[in-house]
């Protein structure tokens, strides 16, 4: 951000994936101010922002009006649990940029089922808060269970947890019918890092029970 000639775009993800940690809004505003000054396009991925305790208040989408170089990405698929429809959107106040994007947009970029699902989701205001509270409660419970199992993890604010272990959890859980994300191919992580989703209580119970079984077999 400090040397304009070396940077055209800055991509940030908040909350991040796969760690699930968010950048404080005050700091994001400072970054946006610096990018505006240096004429660097700031692309902010907020696909998991609805899972934060503060919800939409943590979002930078309303700041796009004051920062022309800010482009915010959001999605319906995470908080509303409809990944199959692949529905998301971008927000920017840069009309020239939006016009250029329109010239290369695919003719059928959003399917009819995705449009219908998105419109239906917008009517479910109460469900977003219910989901946020459920995920928060289950995530905190799972973090405590990982501590009890002496498994290192990264505190998260999203609907998943990143943890580290010498055990090949991807293969061990796959044998038991559970799939988690092997994060070995993430830059900066490597072997031994895994991401597991925070799901419904009964599903989380099954995952944790399987992890206990694996550890007991190895003790």
How does the language model describe each region?
Residues 69-154:
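PLP-dependent aminotransferase class I/II
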Residues 3-6, 18-42, 46-79:
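Active-site pre-lysine segment of PLP-dependent enzymes
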Residues 140, 145-177:
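Conserved PLP-binding catalytic core of the aspartate aminotransferase-like
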Residues 9-13, 43, 89-91:
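Structural motif
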Residues 26, 175-176, 185-219:
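PLP-dependent enzyme catalytic core of the Aspartate aminotransferase-like
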Residues 92, 163-165, 198-200:
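Short beta-strand-to-loop capping motifs
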């Amino acid at each position: 951000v400090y040397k304009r000639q070396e940077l055209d775009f800055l991509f940030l993800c908040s909350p991040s994936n796969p760690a699930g940690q968010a950048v404080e809004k005050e700091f994001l505003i400072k970054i946006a101010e610096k990018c505006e000054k240096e004429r660097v396009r700031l692309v902010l991925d907020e696909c998991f922002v609805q899972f934060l305790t503060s919800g939409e208040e943590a979002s930078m989408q309303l700041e796009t009006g004051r920062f022309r170089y800010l482009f915010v990405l959001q999605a319906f698929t995470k908080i509303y649990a409809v990944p199959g429809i692949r529905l998301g959107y971008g927000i920017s106040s840069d009309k020239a940029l939006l016009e250029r994007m329109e010239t290369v947009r695919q003719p059928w970029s959003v399917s009819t089922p995705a449009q219908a699902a998105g419109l239906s989701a917008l009517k479910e205001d109460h469900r977003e808060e219910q989901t946020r509270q459920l995920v928060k409660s289950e995530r905190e419970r799972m973090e405590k269970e990982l501590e009890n199992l002496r498994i290192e993890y990264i505190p998260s604010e999203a609907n998943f947890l990143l943890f580290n272990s010498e055990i090949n959890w991807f293969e061990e859980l796959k044998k038991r019918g559970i799939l988690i994300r092997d994060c070995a191919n993430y830059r900066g992580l490597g072997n031994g890092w895994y991401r597991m989703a925070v799901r419904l209580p009964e599903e989380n119970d099954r995952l944790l029970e399987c992890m206990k079984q694996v550890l007991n077999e190895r003790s």
